[in-house]
């Protein structure tokens, strides 16, 4: 059941390693793997097909489904962005014109550039995995596309997305926007976010709901827990990766929250329900939550090493 999520990770890694690290032999190896993946996708009508001959559930970039099937409305923009990036990266890595032709076909005949004008459907900051995918992919697409008209369209979609996401104070998202557009990208907030980031990457129990916080109750309308309108500083909240929710106040206190909820007469007491129930010092997060945005910004000249 390989999904589009996994393909995003592969192509982001292949492209950056190819451009920044690989020697000639490694470039040949990367090109061989990328060609196998893209040929499979194109040979199967823009799908990943498993060994049983059935397409996997989520690895779908079929333009007819994305453009015409309402069940794919939330993936339409995101998956359009993905496949255009895969193809452009594939052409850059392999030189195979088949991928450039497929890119132009999706732009010309299937209006995928139009799909990217507002590729993010705003969701009240509830679906963070796709946000991360989008910023990873747009950073590559803007690297490999030279056409000024296409770049302006893609930048329009990125700006629409970032205008919504900048409330999260996500340093990586801010840096991608700045690197790809040359516009002001809230550098000061991003630097503060990284400077405040805990050295201890263990997921400890956190309880912040007792505080006088600004609660956003809208998620409860779709059966989700309340969250904050504004994320807490990095050292006060759960350790976050780029694809996790920075608006959650608590972590690892399910039992305590349930006890308070059942004993309280306050109808809003359920705001104490935590985002997770298993953070008890048993998980260690990857250091890339810090190093990835930091070195991305250093590479693009957005920040400098402190003296």
Question: In which residue ranges do the predicted regions lie?
Answer:
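A surface/extracellular/periplasmic glyco- and lipid-processing/surface-interacting theme
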Residues: 11-51
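Residue-level signal for well-ordered alpha-helical scaffold segments within enzymatic catalytic domains
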Residues: 9-20, 89, 140, 305
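Ser/Thr/Asn(+Pro)-rich, low-complexity disordered segments
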Residues: 37-84, 89-307
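Extended HEAT/HEAT-like alpha-solenoid repeat tracts in very large eukaryotic scaffold/adaptor proteins
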Residues: 2-9, 13, 79-83
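Soluble non-cytosolic domains of exported or imported proteins
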Residues: 4-8, 24, 28, 74-77, ...
